[in-house]
Regions:
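N-terminal subdomain of nucleotide-sugar transferases
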Residues: 8-58
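Aromatic-residue detector
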Residues: 14, 42, 54, 60-61, ...
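Structured loop/turn residues at beta-strand edges in well-structured enzyme cores
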Residues: 22, 74, 106
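Active-site and donor-binding regions of nucleotide-sugar-utilizing enzymes
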Residues: 25-28, 33-43, 67, 81-137
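Conserved nucleotide-sugar phosphate-binding/catalytic loop shared by glycosyltransferases and other
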Residues: 48-94, 98
Length: 137
């Protein structure tokens, strides 16, 4: 099976072997992202056709943790990027550095991001750098 995604910059085709699970990586960082993506993450994690991993940047740690607990979500990777008084550039840089390691380790077929946050930007950019298609919810 092949999934063809007409990308904004260039078209992308992902070839998938039907006998192997599709490797998906969902990236979250804020409470609204986790709230809206929780049902999707739970379904993908329970479906044997997918090998799903969840990475959080914890851009909004306390609020994110509340929602993760409420929906019983567990991150496979926690980048824990936040530091006192850091700029958006520093948040982006720390996210990209952490996501680079996760992308190398998990080698996803598709990356899922949500919304319009710094985490979303970093997740999509990291996937692009690794030539991995992005699905934006």
């Amino acid at each position: 099976m092949a999934i063809s995604c007409p990308g904004w910059v260039m078209p992308v085709t992902v070839s998938l072997e039907p006998s192997k699970p599709i490797r998906l990586l969902s990236i979250l960082g804020t409470r609204p992202e986790a709230t809206k993506m929780a049902p999707v993450v739970r379904i993908l994690s329970a479906d044997g056709r997918f090998q799903h991993a969840l990475v959080v940047t914890a851009q909004h740690r306390e609020m994110l943790d509340q929602v993760m607990g409420l929906f019983q979500l567990k991150a496979d990777f926690d980048l824990d990027i936040m530091r006192n008084r850091q700029s958006l550039s520093q948040i982006t840089s720390r996210s990209l550095t952490g996501l680079d390691r996760v992308m190398e380790q998990t080698k996803p077929d598709l990356v899922l991001v949500h919304g319009d946050t710094t985490t979303t930007l970093a997740g999509a950019l990291s996937a692009y750098y690794h030539q991995i298609p992005v699905a934006h919810v």
